[in-house]
Amino acid sequence: MNANELTIAEARDALAKGELSAVDLTMACLTAIDAGTPLNAFVHATPEIALDQARAADARRGAEAGALNGIPLGIKDLFCTRGVASQAASNILRGFKPEYESTVTSKLFEAGAVMLGKLNMDEFAMGSSNETSCYGDAVNPWKVDDRRLTPGGSSGGSAAAVAADLCLAATGTDTGGSIRQPAAFTGIVGIKPTYGRVSRWGIVAFASSLDQAGPMTKSVRDAAILLGAMAGHDPKDSTSADIPVPDFEAALTGDIRGRKIGIPREYRMEGMPAEIEALWARGREMLADAGAEIVDISLPHTKYALPAYYVIAPAEASSNLARYDGVRYGHRARLGQGDGIVDMYEKTRAEGFGKEVQRRVMIGTYVLSAGFYDAYYNRARKVRALIKRDFDEAFAAGVDAILTPATPSSAFGLGEMADADPVAMYLNDVFTVTVNLAGLPGISVPVGLDAKGLPLGLQLIGRPWDEAGLLNHAHVLERAAGFVEKPRKWW
C-alpha cells in the first residue's frame, strides 16, 4: 500500500509511531497528483507550500502536535487561501489571490494539516456535475466502459481526489447536496454539518443561509477527525454558533441499540430505480440488525423542497454575486472608446460568469423583483419553514436519525445532461436539499455498487447539533456495509 492510500486515522498512527514522515506522506500524494492529471481534480497544486508545511509538521512531532499534524489535504477552490489562487472555478476571479486565510483553512493549518493545493468544483458551487467549472470537467475515477463519468458537484474535484487517493481527505461545501451527492457518486464519505457549526468566513458565498463547509473523507472515522478540526465558533461569522465542539471521534462507539431511525415515506419517489430502493431496504436491515428501531415517518412538505430551494438559492446568489463588477478585483472587461461604467459592469459580468451562473443570477433577480417578491421568494421562505417544521416534529416524536437514499442514481456520463432541460440536472438534489433548507446535519455513506459496478450511497440525517450521534449511526452503517471497493486505476 502506498502512503497516499492511507486514511487519516492510519496515517496519524504511523506518523506518531515514527513509521512514516510527513514529508514522505506528502511526497506520495504529490506523486499521485501528478499521475492523476487526467482526473482534473487539482487545479492549483501547491507543492512548495505542502513540503514546507510537512517539514514543519515533522519538526513539531510529539506533545505539541495538532490533531492533523502532517496530514495532506486538498482544499476546494471556494475557500480563500492566502497568496494562493482562489477563484471559485470562475473566470471572473481569474488571478485573484486573497490577502487572508479562511477560518476553516486557518483551523486546519493550526491543527498541523498540509495543503496540497486547490480542487476543481462547479463555478461558484452552482452545479451537480462539475461541468460548469472554468477549469474544465473534473472526472470520476470510477469508470464504466470507456465513458468519462461525473464525480458529482459542486465539490467534484474534492470527491475525485479523495476517491483516487490523491490526498487523504478534502474540504467541501454543501448548499443543496454539494458534499453528499459527489461523495455518493465516488464511493466516499461526506458530511454536511448543522448550519452554523463550521465558519463560513473566507468561503466565497453562493447562498448564505444554506452554505455549509464539511469534510470529504475515506471513512466515517476520518470525517469525525476532520470535522473536529474544522468546527467551532467564529466571531467573524455572524451565523456561527457559539456551541462547544464535542469529541466526534470518541462518539464512534458503534452502539445504536434502542435508537429510532425514521424512514420518510415521501422519499419513495416515482420512477426511483429498483437498485436504489433495494439499497435503502438493505440499509434499514443493517441498522435494525445493530439494534435500532426502524419507524415510518412522514415529511409531508418534501415535494415542495426542490422548487423552494431553486427560488431561495438563486435569490441569495444574485445578491452575493452583485459584488463581482470588475472594479476592485478579478476580471475586468476591455472597454471600447466611449464605454461608461454600466458598459464595464455588463461586459465584465457577461465575460466572467458562465452560463449556469448567469441563469441563476437572472432567476434570482427575477424572484426578488418588486412584482414577484411575494409570489415567489416569500412563498419559498414559508415552504422552507414548513419543511423545517416537518423535521422538528419527527425529532420531537423521538426519532434519532433519518435514513434516505443519497442520490436518485449512480454517477452519469459527462456531457449526458448537456442538452437536457436544466431541471433534469436540478433533480439530482432531490434527496439532499431538504437538509440544507432545514439547516440539519446530513452524511452520505457508501453502501454498495449498482449493476454497472458504480458506487451508491445512503444518507443519514441527524438532529440539529448532533453530528456526534449522526457520525455514530454512519459508523454502524459503514461497518455493516463493509464497502471497501476502490476504482480500478485507468489514469
Curated annotation (Swiss-Prot):
It comes from Cereibacter sphaeroides (strain KD131 / KCTC 12085). This is Glutamyl-tRNA(Gln) amidotransferase subunit A. Allows the formation of correctly charged Gln-tRNA(Gln) through the transamidation of misacylated Glu-tRNA(Gln) in organisms which lack glutaminyl-tRNA synthetase. The reaction takes place in the presence of glutamine and ATP through an activated gamma-phospho-Glu-tRNA(Gln). GO terms for cellular component: glutamyl-tRNA(Gln) amidotransferase complex. It catalyses: L-glutamyl-tRNA(Gln) + L-glutamine + ATP + H2O = L-glutaminyl-tRNA(Gln) + L-glutamate + ADP + phosphate + H(+). The keyword Nucleotide-binding applies. GO terms for biological process: translation. Keywords: ATP-binding, Ligase, Nucleotide-binding, Protein biosynthesis. Its EC number is 6.3.5.7. HAMAP family: GatA.
